[in-house]
Design a protein with these regions (language model features):
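Conserved Rossmann-fold NAD(P)-dependent oxidoreductase catalytic core, especially the SDR/UDP-sugar
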Residues: 98-142
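Glycine-rich Rossmann NAD(P)(H)-binding loop
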Residues: 172, 194-199, 227-234, 245-248, ...
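NAD(P)H-binding glycine-rich loop region in Rossmannoid oxidoreductase-like domains
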Residues: 50-91, 102, 122
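N-terminal Rossmann NAD(P)H-binding glycine-rich loop of SDR-like oxidoreductase domains
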Residues: 4-24
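Mid/C-terminal beta-alpha module of Rossmann-like enzyme folds, strongest
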Residues: 215-282, 300, 316, 320-323
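Glycine-rich NAD(P)-binding loop of the Rossmann-fold in SDR/ketoreductase-type enzymes
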Residues: 57, 87-98, 145-146, 204
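Substrate-positioning beta->alpha
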Residues: 149-150, 176-181, 195-217, 224-228
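Catalytic helix-loop patch of NAD(P)-dependent Rossmann-fold dehydrogenases
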Residues: 125-171, 191
Length: 327
């Protein structure tokens, strides 16, 4: 069976990808910087994984790790809405360049890259977005810029066959980002709600994203292609919140806020934090306001047609599984 290296293996998505590949008989090399977290991954359903401690931003590490590997899934990244541009460029752009060099040197058959539909984000509603429907000059935040540039690196090189996936809004057991933030906000002052929460949200159970990545490894038709990945079940933001907190046995509390005003506040906050080099993250960022206030749905027909992608965990099931794990 083929041998697959997964970068970012102990991250939220990476853990599910490792287990998905092992379940289908692949030999898996779990790559990450911290041995204790890799050991914890192996103890949590990935006993058969080989561990490789390293940093893909170090050329010697990723080159050594890719020896004897057939496929690489590059899921490692600096994924946050705020930070220094230099950090995003080093990790997400130059780090990807080093992964490509390693794959070329070791004759890896295919590199599957985890990008982000954050590149579609903006100050407007966007529905049924196709893979080509993005602005390459989008600079809403440094993360978006870095993912656009990383994709450019992959498109412009010709030495390694590549596939790019853009999974949207991952959630599930082990999530430390989207749902935990909503729960935390609800238990404090309330969840920010813009436009009555009627904006459409298109999110993805993490198990479905892991499935899509395995399919990208297996499908010859995928080489050179880009795919949107979601659950294919767009829902109003407020409806998702109601479902989530009903499953948790809690009552959602909302902070109804004016969208335009908060976008202006976020813009000013970002400038102040940059100018004075303040620690931490602004209370609101333009990206966060766009994600909470505007509709964004993705067209996944290409993934369905070419990868044979069919979500295996429904939105409702995913929410209930998460809630059960939280209780």
């Amino acid at each position: 069976m083929s041998r697959v290296l997964v970068t970012g293996a102990y991250g939220f998505l990476g853990r599910y990808v490792v287990r998905e590949l092992l379940a289908y008989g692949y030999e898996v090399v779990a790559f990450g910087r911290k041995r204790d977290k890799l050991e914890a991954l192996r103890a949590d359903g990935a006993e058969a994984a080989e561990l490789f401690v390293g940093d893909f931003c170090r050329q010697e590490d990723i080159t050594a790790a890719t020896k004897g590997v057939d496929f690489v899934i590059h899921a490692g990244a600096l994924s946050t809405v705020w930070g220094k541009r230099s950090d995003f460029m080093e990790t997400n752009v130059r780090g990807t360049q080093r992964v490509v060099r390693a794959c070329k040197q070791n004759k890896v058959k295919r590199l599957v890259f985890v990008s982000s539909p954050s590149i579609y984000a903006g100050k407007c509603d966007r529905l049924n977005i196709r893979e080509e429907d993005y602005d390459a000059s989008n600079r809403l935040n440094y993360y978006i810029e870095s993912k656009i540039l990383a994709e450019k690196v992959l498109r412009e090189q010709r030495s390694v066959p590549c596939v790019i996936l853009r999974p949207r809004g991952l959630f599930g057991i082990g999530d430390s980002s989207i749902i935990p933030r909503l729960i935390k906000a609800n238990r404090r002052s309330g969840i920010p709600l813009f436009r009555g929460g009627h904006n459409l949200v298109d999110i993805t159970c993490v198990e479905n994203a892991a499935l899509a990545l395995r399919l990208a490894v297996e499908s010859e038709a995928a080489v050179g292609q880009v795919y949107n990945i979601t659950n294919g079940e767009p829902q109003e933001f407020r409806a998702i919140l109601e479902e989530l907190f009903r499953a948790l046995g809690e009552t959602p509390r909302y902070l109804r806020l004016p969208l335009g005003l908060l976008y202006g506040v976020a813009t000013l906050s970002e400038r102040v934090y940059r100018l004075f080099r303040l620690d931490g993250e602004p209370p609101f960022t333009r990206y966060t306001i766009c994600m909470l206030g505007y509709s964004q749905t993705l067209n996944i027909e290409k993934a369905e047609r070419e990868l044979g992608y069919r979500p295996i965990v429904s939105l409702r099931t995913g929410i209930r599984k998460y809630a059960k794990g939280e209780r």
